[in-house]
A protein has these predicted regions:
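Short pre-active-site segment immediately N-terminal to the catalytic Zn-binding motif
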Residues: 147-163
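Hydrophobic (often cysteine-bearing) scaffold residues that line and stabilize catalytic clefts
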Residues: 92, 157-161, 223
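Metalloprotease/metallohydrolase-associated module, dominated by Zn2+-dependent proteases
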Residues: 96-105, 125-139, 153-155, 178-282, ...
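N-terminal signal-anchor transmembrane alpha helix of single-pass membrane proteins
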Residues: 1-32
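Glycine-rich, often proline-containing surface loops adjacent to acidic residues and nearby aromatics
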Residues: 79, 139-148
Length: 315
């Protein structure tokens, strides 16, 4: 191979590398434009379903409601919904998708792209060798939700317990720190700061038996602390901020949204920070996990086929 051939090959490789991101972004814009035309036809139906069930959605302004519904459409159409011993209805995938969008509404990345499959079961179920029934769990094969418990959560029948938010919180951590398949730069940048506040609270709960509104189940391990904190953040923001103000602010920052701003009438996402220029330690340390190993760099990919989530009636 002569010098000219080497130069040509290097130029081609460099050109591919330089064009990859713009081409990918263009393809994504074209895809979203196509999907938006399809979504518009169904927007009224989506609004009717989501507005009946999600208080969060009803507190958004009109522009943000459309953004919310379109994200719900995109999320739904990126997944295979599988129904186990439960009769499928049109509202099921919409509501599950809407809860995922609620959690990620302040973030740029919201599809949880590692997970192709979402399994909806009728009610509590048994998983693996665990003796206690489960309301939901997340593992390599997908996101699992029991429909009965999911509906109780979004209808406020079980105070401070929302299995949809709980499992989506696990899934969000999974795609950012385990598979790293859909990393949100803001979320990964801010998670170490969240952990600086959260870790001492978790440690005090686990080692010293300190009680707070998060409940005993949050002390199981740091995965569950995170997921339970997400539930309380959306379900009881007033009480959360009153009892654990620093943790509330840290959660508001890492998710880039503040539910209390919606309640007070300010329906905009609280901030849009500059993208991170680097990736810091996620600040998650070993918590005696049965299903995963954890390092200071984040949740590492040694997940066994075991759930990362709450057993039924866990908190």
């Amino acid at each position: 191979m002569n010098l000219m051939e080497i130069v040509v090959i290097c130029s081609l490789v460099l050109g591919i590398l330089l064009l990859n991101r713009p081409v990918t972004m263009l393809a994504q814009r074209l895809y979203n434009r196509h999907q938006f035309r399809r979504f518009i036809v169904r927007e009224t139906f989506y609004h009717s379903v989501v507005s009946r069930h999600l208080v969060y959605y009803n507190r958004l302004g009109l522009g943000e409601q459309r953004k919310f519904l379109f994200r719900t459409w995109l999320f739904q159409h990126s997944k295979n919904f599988r129904y186990i011993e439960v009769e499928q209805t049109a509202e099921m995938p919409i509501l599950v998708s809407a809860v995922a969008v609620q959690l990620t509404f302040g973030l740029d990345k919201f599809k949880l792209n590692y997970f192709d499959d979402i399994f909806i079961l009728r009610d509590d179920y048994h998983y693996g060798f665990y003796s206690r029934p489960f309301m939901g769990h997340v593992d390599q094969t997908g996101i699992y939700l029991s429909w009965d418990n999911f509906m109780k959560g979004i209808s406020k029948q079980t105070p401070n317990c929302n299995v949809g938010l709980h499992e989506m919180a696990h899934a969000l951590a999974y795609v950012n720190f385990v598979t790293e398949t859909e990393e949100d730069r803001h979320f990964k940048k801010e998670f170490p700061n969240f952990s600086k506040v959260a870790r001492p609270i978790f440690t005090a709960m686990q080692l010293d038996g300190v009680k707070n509104l998060l409940g005993d189940y949050a002390a199981t391990n740091y995965h569950e602390f995170w997921a339970v904190a997400v539930e309380i953040f959306f379900e009881s923001p007033v009480n959360f901020r009153h009892e654990l103000p620093e943790l509330y602010e840290a959660m508001s920052t890492v998710l880039n949204q503040d539910p209390l701003s919606f309640i007070s009438g300010n329906t905009t996402i609280i901030r849009r920070l500059q993208p991170a220029t680097g990736m810091a330690s996620a600040g998650i340390g070993s918590a005696g996990m049965a299903s995963s190993s954890i390092t200071s760099a984040g949740i590492t990919a040694s997940i066994a086929p075991a759930p990362t989530s709450a057993a039924a009636a866990a908190h």
